């Protein structure tokens, strides 16, 4: 995919909120996905300066889940305009985390919030990813973050 097409996808995603381009999933090496996430957040802030953006990596997501369980608390749905989860591979196969993620993605989609998820490979290649989460992610746009791939 060439860079100009990739940027058109990101620009469309950040300018038009809601379900049209939701969710956005891209995969590849960390330096590529991080660069695209940085660009998405910068672009989103340009078009929506007051937006509440929540950016978590899989490790932070898991740690927050563990804290909630240990404290006896309930999972809360993040009230953000843009939810970014980096490296879904780190959540895949962990039932409690996947259950929480499914609820979050469901609420965000129903409430027309933007979702960005990254991974190391296409969702079909993440064999331990729960089918219902794969379906949620695959309902949007997916592409390789590596320019020219």
Please give the residue ranges for each predicted region.
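Pre-Walker A (pre-P-loop) alpha-helix and adjacent loop at the N terminus of AAA/AAA+ ATPase modules
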Residues: 1-23
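Short glycine-rich substrate-engagement loop in P-loop NTPases that contacts/grips substrate
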Residues: 3, 45-82, 92-99
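Walker A/P-loop nucleotide-binding motif
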Residues: 18-38
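P-loop NTPase Walker A phosphate-binding motif
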Residues: 34-49
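Walker B catalytic acidic pair
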Residues: 86-90, 120
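Conserved ATPase-coupling elements of RecA-like P-loop NTPase cores
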Residues: 89-102, 126-129
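Sensor-1/coupling segment of RecA-like P-loop NTPase cores
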Residues: 104-131
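A short helix-turn-beta junction within AAA+ P-loop NTPase domains corresponding to the substrate/partner-engaging
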Residues: 129-148
